[in-house]
């Protein structure tokens, strides 16, 4: 007898949605399409030769380690390297504070598994990272959404949501995905103080913090938390769990991220990871360590910044040249994305259908809102990625997209002749 599989699925799977971005990427595989949809790093800046050399060296010198099971916590030299690397941003951690994960997406899943019971409330930004909503929703999270503006999360709107006692808050302070905004230093202090006042942990997701193209680096929340607690003894206690990744600085295909947290939190996460995949690939961790060593990672990040800064500037210039004046957008100081706001009455989902016919793709904004976080607000927004397309492709793609935008806006009200 054939199994009726749908009757066997766990209750927690019923609310799971496919990633809108993963679905869009199927469309963008067509060669004629210029895609601003995925958050893809530029493949031409991958250090491919460095990886080839590292793979050969690891297999020649340490195959007995690279091809064997490893510690769940991760490859110790890599954990030590990460601790040294993040120290330059003021994060005082030891290797015992670092857990290597299979990308920061696994880190989000492990945190959801650790902290969320069905029905627990999680405070998130509106809009926020789609992958976090997917990870947390599996464990039955309800959401409390707080809006963002050009300075990031509205800290003046945090007190009442925090007073209601969410399990934790999830924030992306640097060059937020999807908005491209950065949480101001003043708001960072306010957020940390309020979280401490109400005893709410913070999950600080920082995949883009090293990709700053202008301005000064701002202190991570985890650093401000240490200052607030008046502790200078390393990362023994604290209210912040910090996440980051090699996906945006080396390559996403190696699937390596990390969690930095107090040892008692790391030990519980280690137990959960053991049940998930035992450990992240030993071979890949050793290769990544070999690639990043001898100051290569720092120099490579400088290259990435130059490339992405140029592409951001090209996109901003093209938007100014081609888009109608009633359409606005953010001017990110780093990261991979900018956020476009259409006038009232416009619909990014319908715009996408028109854009497809012009062979250009983006991500409509509604998928970046929690179910109770006013997703209808997202229908006036679209996320554009500027890292993966070449400057010439960006210019052409924005021109194509402007044609689709003008067609939709003409349906709302006639445009001046010069803008058609």
Language-model-derived ranges and their functions:
Residues 58-199, 203, 209-234, 241, ...:
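Conserved core of the PLP fold type I
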């Amino acid at each position: 007898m054939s199994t009726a599989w749908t009757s066997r699925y766990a209750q927690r799977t019923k609310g799971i949605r496919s990633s809108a971005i993963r679905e869009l990427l199927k469309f963008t595989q067509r060669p004629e399409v210029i895609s601003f949809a995925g958050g893809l790093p530029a493949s031409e800046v991958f250090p491919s030769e460095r990886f080839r050399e590292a793979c050969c060296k690891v297999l020649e010198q340490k195959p007995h380690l690279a091809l064997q099971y490893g510690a769940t916590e991760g490859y110790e030299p890599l954990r030590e390297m990460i601790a040294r690397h993040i120290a330059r941003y003021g994060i005082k951690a030891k290797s015992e504070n670092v857990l290597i994960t299979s990308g920061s997406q696994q880190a989000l899943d492990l945190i959801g598994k650790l902290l969320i019971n069905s029905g627990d409330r999680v405070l998130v930004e509106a809009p926020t990272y789609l992958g976090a909503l997917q990870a947390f929703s599996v464990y039955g999270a309800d959401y409390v959404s707080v809006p963002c503006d050009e300075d990031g999360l509205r800290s003046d709107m945090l007190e009442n949501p925090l007073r209601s006692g969410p399990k934790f808050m999830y924030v992306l302070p640097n060059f937020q995905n999807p908005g491209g905004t950065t949480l101001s230093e003043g708001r960072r202090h306010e957020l940390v103080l309020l979280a401490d006042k109400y005893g709410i942990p913070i999950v600080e997701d920082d995949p883009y913090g090293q990709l700053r193209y202008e301005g000064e680096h701002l202190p991570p929340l985890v650093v401000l938390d240490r200052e607030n607690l008046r502790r200078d003894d390393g990362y023994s206690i604290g209210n912040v769990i910090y996440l980051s990744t090699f996906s945006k600085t080396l390559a996403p295909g190696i699937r390596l991220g990390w969690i930095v947290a107090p040892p008692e939190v790391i030990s519980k996460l280690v137990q959960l990871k053991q049940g998930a995949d035992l450990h992240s690939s030993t071979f890949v961790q050793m290769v990544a360590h070999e690639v990043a060593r001898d100051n290569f990672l720092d120099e490579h990040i400088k290259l990435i910044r130059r490339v992405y800064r140029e592409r951001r500037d090209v996109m901003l210039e093209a938007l100014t040249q081609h888009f109608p004046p009633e359409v606005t957008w953010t001017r990110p100081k780093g990261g991979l994305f900018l956020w476009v706001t259409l006038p009232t009455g416009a619909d990014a989902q319908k715009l996408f259908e028109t854009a497809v016919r012009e062979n250009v793709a983006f991500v409509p904004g509604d998928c970046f809102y929690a179910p109770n976080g006013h997703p209808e607000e997202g229908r006036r927004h679209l996320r554009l990625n500027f890292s993966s397309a070449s400057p010439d492709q960006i210019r052409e793609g924005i021109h194509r997209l402007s044609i689709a935008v003008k067609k939709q806006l003409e349906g709302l009200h006639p445009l001046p002749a010069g803008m058609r």
